[in-house]
UniProtKB/Swiss-Prot annotation:
One of its GO terms (biological process) is alginic acid biosynthetic process. The lineage of its organism: Bacteria, Pseudomonadati, Pseudomonadota, Gammaproteobacteria, Pseudomonadales. The keyword Transferase applies. It comes from Azotobacter vinelandii. This is Alginate biosynthesis protein AlgX. GO terms for molecular function: acyltransferase activity.
Length: 483
């Protein structure tokens, strides 16, 4: 399994003892004489936690409103962890179908790993009043209906609902964080692996045995705990959980692969798929196949997907199977994601005939510059529904694109596309022109681009407009019910 390097915690005993004691953690003697540290319950939520108006920043609004579990350090978000509605809008499902068909045209089978919520999995940790108020049966019913809808669009969809209402330890989720623990990742990977094995393309993927080993302990000050601390001026102890790594059986250290070939299965997703929780490793062990893990912290729904689609790894050697992990909190109807993904999946304007091109130098403190004009040299037909743009900055660290598009009718569109700040980027943005509702028939006139935020030196920007890709799945590709 190819992954990024991970860090794990193994502090000196004295330093650890001091730090843990300061965080409300006590040590108990064991028969071996070695101390075992246990976090004591910390805090009760204050009245501000129950007031949605207390959650003032955009980040904090994602935690409205925190409620305390039957142990004080178990916290839940009522809007997200205790939700009973899932899925997306008709437009969101239409976009998901288009994305599936585009991947299918490249010979890629897509697997959606849709995580059950913390409330569905850990409802036994709720206080009696919240336990009674949370409509678990409705949540599971709607969750399964969403999985079925994904499947009808052509995706392969493992059903993780057997993991709900768990009463086993170690827990699936952290007490005070939205991430799953390594144990939650492992239990999910078992189910996902069985679905992947059903895909006909999996039969042609080389097999390899993997083994998973414990590598130490991970310390986490959870997202729920941090927000509660801001609201109530409290400090929760670090929560510790086992951390694992996976390697080919019989091989230790060195090259994890033994060869330089790319795996034929790729994992994209949120920070849940990052190396901290070893989800990719567990998948490799249970599938018996290598995985290219391109997920990274801070990726969100689309970050690792878009970065991977723009990479040489995907463009020159697309995988046979792409596993896409995300949670229900993300908006699957977000048009900006699909506009970028459907453009980059075909490498945007690379290899396509350029209809319009322009360049400009953007300088700190200056206003935006017009970089592309239809009719300056020649007038071309450039309706939104049939075209895309490919934009490249000379500085690869640019992570935000802002600008305005004008149309022949006089209408205009302000646009903004962002990349995660937690990963290296290449300065390239590409997207299909806006085509929903009455936008599709508009004809492009001009584009203005703003200097990037925090710009200190002049930067060059080049823009190309070309026809968008027309994805038609070849008939000889494996079909599945709903395809």
């Amino acid at each position: 399994m190819k992954t990024h390097n991970s860090k794990w915690i193994g502090p000196a005993a004295l330093a650890a003892a001091i730090a843990l004691a300061a965080a409300g953690v006590r040590a108990e003697e064991t028969p071996t004489g070695l101390p075992v540290y246990r976090a004591e319950s910390c805090c009760d939520l204050c009245p501000a936690a129950a007031d949605p108006n207390s959650y003032t920043s955009n980040y904090m609004k994602g935690f409205v409103t925190l409620v305390q579990g039957n142990e004080s350090d178990w916290l839940f978000r009522t809007n997200e962890d205790l939700r009973t509605e899932f899925g997306t809008t008709p437009e969101g499902y239409r976009q998901l179908k288009a994305l599936h068909d585009a991947f299918k045209s490249r010979g890629v089978e897509l697997v959606i790993v849709y995580q059950p919520t913390r409330g569905m999995v850990q409802r036994n940790k709720l206080l009696p009043a919240d336990y009674a108020r949370f409509d678990y049966d409705k949540a599971v019913r709607n969750f399964r209906a969403t999985l079925k809808h994904f499947e009808q669009l052509g995706y392969w969809v493992p059903d993780l609902t057997p993991l709900t209402d768990e009463k086993v330890e170690p827990a699936f989720y952290f007490r005070g964080d939205h991430h799953w623990t390594s144990y939650g990742a492992e239990r999910s990977a078992r189910i996902v692996a069985e679905t992947v094995k059903e895909i006909p393309a999996f039969a042609d993927i080389p097999r390899k045995e993997f083994v998973t080993k414990k590598m130490g302990r991970m310390g986490k000050r959870g997202t729920h705990h941090r927000v509660a601390g801001q609201l109530c001026n409290t400090t929760y102890a670090f929560e510790h959980s086992d951390q694992f790594f996976t390697e080919p059986k019989g091989e230790g250290g060195g090259d994890l692969f033994g060869d330089s070939s790319l795996p034929q299965i790729t994992l994209v997703g949120t920070s849940h798929s990052g190396t901290n929780y070893n989800f990719a490793g567990f998948l490799s062990e249970y599938m018996g196949a290598e995985i290219l893990n391109v997920a990274f912290p801070g990726s969100g729904l689309e970050g690792s997907m878009l970065k991977y689609l723009a990479s040489d790894e995907f463009q020159k050697n697309p995988p046979k199977i792409l596993i896409w992990e995300f949670s229900p909190l993300y908006d699957l109807a977000e048009d900006k994601f699909y506009r970028q993904a459907l453009s980059m999946l075909g490498n945007a304007c690379e290899g396509e005939k350029t209809l319009l091109a322009g360049k400009a130098t953007l300088r700190p403190g200056e206003a935006g510059k017009e970089v592309l004009i239809n009719g300056a040299g020649r007038l071309v037909e450039a309706t939104n529904s049939r075209h895309q743009v490919d934009i490249r900055f000379s500085d690869p660290s640019v992570k935000k694109l802002e600008g305005t598009i004008w149309y022949m009718t006089g209408r205009r569109e302000k646009f903004q596309f962002d990349k995660p700040v937690t990963t290296e980027t290449n300065g390239r943005f590409a997207f299909n022109m806006r085509d929903e509702a009455d936008w599709g028939g508009l004809n492009f006139f001009a584009m203005e681009i703003q200097p990037p935020e925090g710009l200190k030196e002049p930067v060059e920007v080049e823009v190309r407009l070309c026809k968008r890709h027309d994805y038609h799945a070849p008939a000889n590709l494996t079909a599945r019910s709903g395809n």
